[in-house]
Amino acid sequence: MKDMSNKKIFKKYSRVAGLLTAALIVGNLVTANADSNKQNTANTETTTTNEQPKPESSELTTEKAGQKMDDMLNSNDMIKLAPKEMPLESAEKEEKKSEDNKKSEEDHTEEINDKIYSLNYNELEVLAKNGETIENFVPKEGVKKADKFIVIERKKKNINTTPVDISIIDSVTDRTYPAALQLANKGFTENKPDAVVTKRNPQKIHIDLPGMGDKATVEVNDPTYANVSTAIDNLVNQWHDNYSGGNTLPARTQYTESMVYSKSQIEAALNVNSKILDGTLGIDFKSISKGEKKVMIAAYKQIFYTVSANLPNNPADVFDKSVTFKELQAKGVSNEAPPLFVSNVAYGRTVFVKLETSSKSNDVEAAFSAALKGTDVKTNGKYSDILENSSFTAVVLGADAAEHNKVVTKDFDVIRNVIKANATFSRKNPAYPISYTSVFLKNNKIAGVNNRSEYVETTSTEYTSGKINLSHQGAYVAQYEILWDEINYDDKGKEVITKRRWDNNWYSKTSPFSTVIPLGANSRNIRIMARECTGLAWEWWRKVIDERDVKLSKEINVNISGSTLSPYGSITYK
């Protein structure tokens, strides 16, 4: 019933619309008839014809039109309207097109400069990267294993770095090319920069390959990633064809190393995403935090050439004049995320080396550093022992990485060969983007990520159980006092000291006498005293040995000998 009612209403309004249209037509007819009657009256005066038709009066015409409209209103038939396209639509299209052309011709250079210069921000704050915050940790822990006692010591450390060259990974090369525009926001600090894509002015770029002179600089009309990459490829090919002289180009090497304690710490120390290191080198951060492993990472950045983009005198120099600040705002530009300009990109390869050991020696870092610097560690027994119980991994990113994609070995000489191999630029060993530097578009100040992080430096020291060998060969009566502490740690890392003493302290011993006193691996503060009876009334007892800080060793040999008036004592270690 409701549908039927709607149809009737629709028909009624259709008839009303038709009636209005008909009224307009009738009005035109009445006007036309009136003009026709005037014409006929004029003709009557000059004709001789006796029979002249009487024109319909306007009243009659109106009456017929009214009757027709009533019939239309009372009819159930739909009135179809077919409006014609008005010529005005075409005119509106032309007008809109003209307005668009005017907008594209408008110069917004002054507006862009004013707005970017007026951006209010702190360079260090907008690019601050706050890593881990350490609240609770166990400062010390003791672990007993057979004849070993391992002390794991943890210290809270802070690291604050501001690197200006940022490592490039494959996923961001399309937004870290020379002259690219970026936002100084969280994404930039995490090596995932947000690009600002808009209409650009032509941009000059320069490559620092030797011998090219003026040919080393070209202008890219539309500096997109594809166009800039093509221009760089052309420059490199020109150098190979015309300026290399068939020679290779040695790399400029930058080297950094650091022990690994946590993800945020190694990111800040080496300026590289820990996920890349973890994925390529397989760093076991859990074992490191437990003190079970010690790991050092070295990064060799081998640069073949650098491509620089000419810095703009004013911010608007990089934009087409049609670009508005409103458009830049829509794409993220603000006080919290000011625009950046990629000023240069280094091309070459990066070699990451992981040195890993389960040794608890305090000389691990020194041994690893010596190996990386090419020092002959075979002459140093401690270093040699550490390296013999270590494993090494090298990963090459960029250049001819297929040859040495990942190498795992126990022989560090193999790692040295990986570092040296393919360290020269040639057609067979091409360069890849490895790092870039950006500047703030407002003032061309270098944009450095301000890394602030806390981390726990974990060191582990391994102690082995020992013993004291007492030997009395003197011509006198002797007495001993042997004391030591046994160290443990509670669940909060607090040191717990248990006092220990030899059961035969102060017992008189005649020569020859010998015995063995076992010491646990957690023994500290060892004191050894031996005295002899002189028989002299004024000096009945005389000390032969009195050592209060004897170090724990596998064997501590305590020997006393001589006569009452000339005793002799010594402590040796084995």
Curated annotation (Swiss-Prot):
Composition bias, Low complexity: 37-52
Keyword Metal-binding: no
Gene Ontology biological process terms from the UniProt entry: killing of cells of another organism
Keyword Membrane: yes
Cellular compartment(s): Secreted; Host cell membrane
Any matching Pfam family: Thiol_cytolysin
Entry's transmembrane regions: 263-276, 283-292, 361-370, 378-390
Signal peptide stretch: 1-36
Domain of life the protein comes from: Bacteria
InterPro entries in the cross-refs: Thiol_cytolys_C, Thiol_cytolys_C_sf, Thiol_cytolysin, Thiol_cytolysin_ab_sf, Thiol_cytolysin_sf
UniProt keyword annotations, A-Z: Cytolysis, Hemolysis, Host cell membrane, Host membrane, Lipid-binding, Membrane, Secreted, Signal, Toxin, Transmembrane, Transmembrane beta strand, Virulence
Principal place of residence: secreted
Motif Conserved undecapeptide positions after renumbering to this chain: 532-542
SUBUNIT field: Homooligomeric pore complex of 35 to 50 subunits; when inserted in the host membrane.
Protein name: Streptolysin O
Native source organism of the sequence: Streptococcus canis
Record gene name: slo
